[in-house]
Regions:
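Conserved active-site and SAM-binding loop architecture
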Residues: 1-179
Length: 179
């Protein structure tokens, strides 16, 4: 979504992931740590997996620390943040990056960009300004919430992928403001 928003504005945008791209466009299927050192990049917007980092999985933190998964995830984020790229944004939900690496530079919500949704998202920035809200929608409850305020997406094999998707209007704001 983010790659496509930048490409739509004429940028030479490339996505990198172990998974294949779900849309047409420039995509490298592989390890981003191998790719970022392969050439000069001017901007990286990274979305590291939140599986071992987000507070939504806090009940499993002891197990993840004991077997090293959490330390490995933090080392990956640190490698992304310290990459030799002048402009970097790292996106992740509220989690342990804030306590183990550093606090986020900004916390955004989809409703700040015209989306009828709530999803507290942290941004760690290097060489980039905070995103400016575009169209703010304030509600007591958003379309993706239950009456108690929880995410209403039912459990499913691809729930992780659906919940991790970047909202289009946030991607558009990144492209117009950082591109």
């Amino acid at each position: 979504v983010v790659r496509d928003a930048f490409a739509k504005l004429g940028h030479n945008a490339v996505s990198v992931d172990f998974l294949p791209s779900e849309t047409e466009g420039k995509h490298i299927q592989g390890d981003v740590l191998d790719v970022i050192g392969s050439r000069q990049w001017d901007l990286m917007i990274a979305f590291p997996p939140c599986t071992h980092l987000a507070v939504s999985g806090a009940r499993y933190f002891a197990e993840k620390r004991a077997d090293g998964r959490q330390q490995e995830a933090l080392a990956f984020v640190e490698a992304l943040l310290t990459a030799d790229i002048p402009k970097i944004a790292i996106e992740n939900p509220v989690g342990i990056i804030s306590t183990h690496i550093r606090k986020p530079d900004q916390i955004i919500q989809p409703w700040m960009f015209g989306e009828d949704a709530s999803k507290k998202t942290c941004l760690w920035l290097k060489g980039l300004p905070p995103l400016m809200a575009t169209t703010v929608i304030k509600k007591k409850r958003y379309a993706n919430q239950t009456p108690s305020g929880q995410n209403k997406l039912a459990p499913s094999p691809d729930r992780w992928k659906i919940r991790s998707k970047t909202y289009q209007k946030i991607a558009d704001a990144m492209a117009t403001q950082w591109g």
